[in-house]
């Protein structure tokens, strides 16, 4: 009597084939390192009116976060390598973010212990060059 009360033949509980398969997380299915479940939980908790969040939306946001993190870490690693050190510091993060035009517009935050970029205003440089030129002519 499939479909009636009592013992049924079909269903997940009766099949022995699915017992051998290991469970895969959403992150593993999408090939990501960041946790999709945690991102989904944050999205659900931080939205107004307790809006529903789809599974694909959480995977997409997780992929974007992972890509941006990898991009920043790669640039910061290059900055650390240029300075011949093996540890990435907030200064390297600052140099990496401010050195890339797109990341600079995206991340407008102040990075603690990041310092400032070495920059001299062009107007000041022109005055110094003119003074040097006047001294050589005189």
From Swiss-Prot:
InterPro entries membership: Histone-fold (IPR009072), Histone_H2A (IPR002119), Histone_H2A/H2B/H3 (IPR007125), Histone_H2A_C (IPR032454)
Compartments where located: Nucleus; Chromosome
Superkingdom in the source lineage: Eukaryota
Cross-referenced Gene3D superfamilies: Histone, subunit A (1.10.20.10)
Post-translational modification remark: Acetylated once deposited into chromatin.
Entry keywords, A to Z: Acetylation, Chromosome, DNA-binding, Nucleosome core, Nucleus
Subunit structure: The nucleosome is a histone octamer containing two molecules each of H2A, H2B, H3 and H4 assembled in one H3-H4 heterotetramer and two H2A-H2B heterodimers. The octamer wraps approximately 147 bp of DNA. H2A or its variant H2A.Z forms a heterodimer with H2B. H2A.Z associates with the vps72/swc2 subunit of the SWR1 chromatin remodeling complex. Also interacts with rbp1/DNA-directed RNA polymerase II largest subunit.
Function statement: Variant histone H2A which can replace H2A in some nucleosomes. Nucleosomes wrap and compact DNA into chromatin, limiting DNA accessibility to the cellular machineries which require DNA as a template. Histones thereby play a central role in transcription regulation, DNA repair, DNA replication and chromosomal stability. DNA accessibility is regulated via a complex set of post-translational modifications of histones, also called histone code, and nucleosome remodeling.
Protein name per its UniProtKB record: Histone H2A.Z
